[in-house]
Amino acid sequence: QRALTRYYLDAGAGGLAVGVHTTQFAIREAGLFAPVLELAMRSATDWARERPIMIAGLAGRTAQTVQEAQIARDLGYHAGLLSLAALKGAHEDELIAHAQAVAREIPLVGFYLQPAVGGLLLPVPFWRRFAEIENVIAIKIAPFNRYRTLDVVRGVVEAGAADRITLYTGNDDHIVLDLLTPFPAGANGGKTVVRIKGGLLGHWSVWVKRAVELLERIHASVASGAIPANLLALDAQVTDCNAAIFDVANDFHGVIAGCHEILRRQGLLAGTWCLDPQETLGPGQKEEIDRVCAAYPHLNDDAFVRANLERWLS
């Protein structure tokens, strides 16, 4: 964890999200939630020249999530990324009350998790009400679905919260175009737009140096008003890589182990093991990762990692 934190910060990441995806939700069952968050915070504080944004993953029913929010707040985390997966089947009023309770403890980053991996279907009215919660500062949009992505944007706009809430893409299948798209902000013929400003992505737990460079390039292109064709082409290339790393062919079975495999190949992890022994690479996933590594060498940061690995592991 210490070496990964150092890698992410030296690669230029603006912040770290701890307790989600590759950190594994299972740390909670293993009694590792607080120790992992504490180690990541201490590592980031000791290593970074400028303090990064630190976000803690929050999960479970209300009592557990509130407790996790208190732990994260006391450790100095800036915000909590709120998973609603444990509230499947709950009424919208219950979901909003849950979010309000957690928001009283720590600033919130909303999280639209794709249903394929346990997320709930959350319509526009939910996102409008969620965006009205004053201590919501951002939303990670990750339904892996164009229509549902628009639902989040529309809900934030209808709540009048577009200037207060920062939107992040979590759509690992559509990273580049999410960041390039001017989303409509109302019924004025699309003259006013809302933009997704950054990424909070499992895919960006690997090849981080290249991800940072890509984000900077996208921001520069948006500012200039000129989007080159080769930048648009990167969307499909990044998505192809993500299909391998997230094990889409096996319905995301190896979604964590695939990220671990990239980090293992670079020497940042000793293996691909997960706390849940069922979390392994899927059938054929290793070969798919081989394929995309060979097809898109410009998307990896292997040379950067090689040059710094010994220092990070010290």
What are the roles of these predicted feature ranges?
Residues A101-R104, Q114-V255:
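Catalytic alpha/beta core domains of metabolic enzymes, predominantly
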Residues Q1-W127, Q278, D302-L313:
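Active-site beta->alpha loop and helix N-cap motifs at the rims of alpha/beta catalytic domains
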Residues R42, E213, H260-R264:
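Generic alpha-helical structural context detector
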Residues A44-W47, E158-I165, V222, A270, ...:
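Structural alpha-beta junctions
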Residues N242-S314:
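C-terminal extensions of enzymes
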Residues A13, Y77, N135, A161, ...:
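Residue-level recognition of short, well-ordered coil/turn positions
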Residues A3-Y7, P35, L39, N230-A244, ...:
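A non-catalytic, amphipathic alpha-helix used as a structural packing/dimerization or gating element
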